[in-house]
């Protein structure tokens, strides 16, 4: 007599049989490419893949797993994808993306994967680190109280930057954003601060020009240049800031100071938007994906000043009593001065202040074109050098009063003496804040210029001769008070003796009339 099975028994039997089948590791860790388009590969059958994992493809090509769906994986190819075909085998690697780190990278130009592209041979780096890392926790951080000198009077006096700060440089195209950041890198020569310059989506010719300028000014030796140019894929432009940050963190973790420039994060957001739309992620405001804020916040939060305990723990006691820092200068390009667009507002809210560069000021010959009214440094004041902090208070006030009165003076024909003096002082302060590119100024020279204008020594100097006067004054002090100049540059201190020397030196120089 035939055995009859009821439906529930059949169901149980099938379940038991399925559970008894042991899938081999190979079948869980191997899949096949189902489609390749626009740098995105869809892979079927990778059951064990992790978010952000490296996937190995034929011809030594790798992809980054970004979308984990029910029965397929969406991954972005790192590099060329012309040789990939439907049906190609894809394998999991069990690793996330890592890049080379260490002092061997200084003086070199690398791509987003840390591969040298400057024709100077292999890097020789022995260590690697993952491009994505959780930012240091609150317990491991220290407050920002050491300065990063940019060499610009307007920035160091009014918008000071500290080690471990994130200071946004924002403005329209062609307003001098990159110039300001490159001069800040050049000014770190001899300070021990290591620099990382990340070029995102820029022309290769522009990057080559920047590298040449760094070399000419002796700054390439302490700098790593990470370049993901406009001709490279969106994936490379998306990961390049994280790769650069990892290279900078190497120095921070070991009790050293580093400065990183992201030029610029607007292009990274565009690259990420492109990848997200190709992966069929739902678009949000301005077609950016929902996590574009997290894209930048997780990057910029990695810039910090870490405590002695953090460094000691990280190095297993090899480095003691030293704090480390990574200072970030992200750059954002605005359209027609619109700082209320999606990405600019995001980055403004993440950073510790912003330097706003204005087209009108730039075209009027005021360079760097810093708008002192809406530029701010939220934490840098505590890090400012003592002498600059003491002297620079009058600068902001003079400029604010000048801007207010200048608008009013357009309609008034006869002005009283006090108003006229304020206007003239404001004109001189504005003129004095001008500075040539690739000519960062030392602390002593900045202090001297600020002191001279604050104390009224420049009131009789014609505005058009002001910069020549300043140049001559600096040369006079270098020749006659060399010891004092080097003392100020070393200590950054301020006392009555220095003030007396400043007064005497300025009066002496004015009597020579050699300007």
From Swiss-Prot:
It holds the Pfam family ATP-synt_ab. NCBIfam families: atpA (TIGR00962), PRK13343.1 (NF009884). It is a peripheral membrane protein. Its EC number is 7.1.2.2. GO terms for biological process: proton motive force-driven ATP synthesis. Produces ATP from ADP in the presence of a proton gradient across the membrane. The alpha chain is a regulatory subunit. This is ATP synthase subunit alpha. One of its GO terms (cellular component) is proton-transporting ATP synthase complex. CDD domains: ATP-synt_F1_alpha_C, ATP-synt_F1_alpha_N, F1-ATPase_alpha_CD. The record marks 375 as: Required for activity. ATP binds at residues 171-178. It is found in: Cell inner membrane. It is an enzyme of class 7 (translocase). One of its GO terms (molecular function) is proton-transporting ATP synthase activity, rotational mechanism. It catalyses: ATP + H2O + 4 H(+)(in) = ADP + phosphate + 5 H(+)(out). Keywords: ATP synthesis, ATP-binding, Cell inner membrane, Cell membrane, CF(1), Hydrogen ion transport, Ion transport, Membrane, Nucleotide-binding, Translocase, Transport. It comes from the Bacteria. The gene is atpA. Its main location: membrane. Belongs to the ATPase alpha/beta chains family. It comes from Xanthomonas campestris pv. campestris (strain ATCC 33913 / DSM 3586 / NCPPB 528 / LMG 568 / P 25). F-type ATPases have 2 components, CF(1) - the catalytic core - and CF(0) - the membrane proton channel. CF(1) has five subunits: alpha(3), beta(3), gamma(1), delta(1), epsilon(1). CF(0) has three main subunits: a(1), b(2) and c(9-12). The alpha and beta chains form an alternating ring which encloses part of the gamma chain. CF(1) is attached to CF(0) by a central stalk formed by the gamma and epsilon chains, while a peripheral stalk is formed by the delta and b chains. InterPro entries: ATP_synth_asu-like_sf (IPR023366), ATP_synth_asu_C (IPR000793), ATP_synth_asu_C_sf (IPR038376), ATP_synth_F1_a_nt-bd_dom (IPR033732), ATP_synth_F1_asu (IPR005294), ATPase_a/bsu_AS (IPR020003), ATPase_F1/V1/A1_a/bsu_N (IPR004100), ATPase_F1/V1/A1_a/bsu_N_sf (IPR036121).
């Amino acid at each position: 007599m035939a055995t009859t099975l009821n439906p529930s028994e059949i169901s149980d039997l099938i379940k038991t049989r399925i559970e008894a089948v042991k899938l081999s590791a190979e079948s869980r860790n191997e899949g096949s490419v189902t489609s390749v388009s626009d740098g995105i590969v869809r892979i079927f059958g990778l059951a064990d893949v992790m978010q952000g994992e490296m996937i190995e493809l034929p011809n030594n090509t790798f992809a980054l797993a970004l979308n984990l769906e029910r029965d397929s994986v969406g991954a972005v190819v790192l590099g060329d994808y012309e040789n990939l075909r439907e049906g190609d085998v894809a394998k999991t690697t069990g690793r996330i993306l890592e890049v080379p780190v260490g002092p061997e990278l200084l003086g070199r130009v690398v791509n987003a994967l840390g591969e040298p592209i400057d024709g100077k041979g292999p890097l020789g780096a022995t260590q690697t680190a993952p491009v994505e890392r959780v930012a240091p926790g609150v317990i491991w951080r220290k407050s920002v109280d050491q300065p990063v000198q940019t060499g610009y009077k307007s920035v160091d006096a009014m918008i000071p930057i500290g080690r471990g700060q994130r200071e946004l440089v924002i403005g329209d195209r062609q307003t001098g954003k990159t110039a300001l950041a490159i001069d800040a890198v050049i000014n770190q020569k001899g300070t021990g601060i290591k620099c990382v310059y990340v070029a995102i989506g820029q022309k290769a010719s522009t990057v080559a020009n920047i590298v040449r300028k760094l070399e000419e000014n002796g700054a390439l030796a302490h700098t790593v240049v990470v370049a993901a140019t406009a001709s490279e894929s969106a994936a490379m432009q998306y990961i390049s800031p994280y790769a650069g940050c990892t290279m900078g963190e190497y120095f921070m973790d070991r009790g050293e100071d580093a400065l990183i420039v992201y030029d610029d994060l607007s292009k990274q957001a565009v690259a990420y938007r492109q990848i997200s739309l190709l992966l069929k992620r739902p678009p949000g405001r301005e077609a950016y994906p929902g996590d574009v804020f997290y894209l930048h916040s997780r990057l910029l939060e990695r810039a910090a000043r870490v405590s002695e305990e953090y460094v000691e723990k990280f190095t297993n006691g090899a480095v003691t009593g030293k704090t480390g820092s990574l200072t970030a200068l992200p750059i954002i390009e605005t359209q027609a001065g619109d700082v209320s667009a999606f990405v600019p507002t995001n980055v403004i809210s993440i950073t510790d202040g912003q330097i706003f560069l204005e087209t009108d000021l730039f075209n009027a010959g005021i360079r760097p074109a810093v708008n002192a009214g809406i530029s701010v440094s939220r934490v840098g004041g505590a890090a400012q050098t003592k002498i600059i902090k003491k002297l620079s208070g009058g600068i902001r006030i003079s400029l604010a009063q000048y801007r207010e009165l200048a608008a009013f003076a357009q309609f008034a024909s006869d002005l009283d003496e006090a108003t006229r003096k304020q206007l003239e002082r404001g004109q001189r302060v504005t003129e004095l804040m001008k500075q040539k590119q690739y000519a960062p100024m030392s602390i002593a020279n900045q202090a001297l210029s600020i002191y001279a204008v604050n104390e009224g020594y420049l009131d009789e100097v014609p505005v058009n001769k002001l910069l020549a006067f300043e140049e001559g004054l600096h040369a006079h002090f270098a020749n006659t008070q060399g010891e004092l100049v080097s003392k100020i540059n070393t200590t950054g201190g301020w006392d009555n003796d220095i003030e007396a020397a400043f007064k005497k030196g300025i009066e002496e120089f004015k009597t020579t009339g050699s300007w």
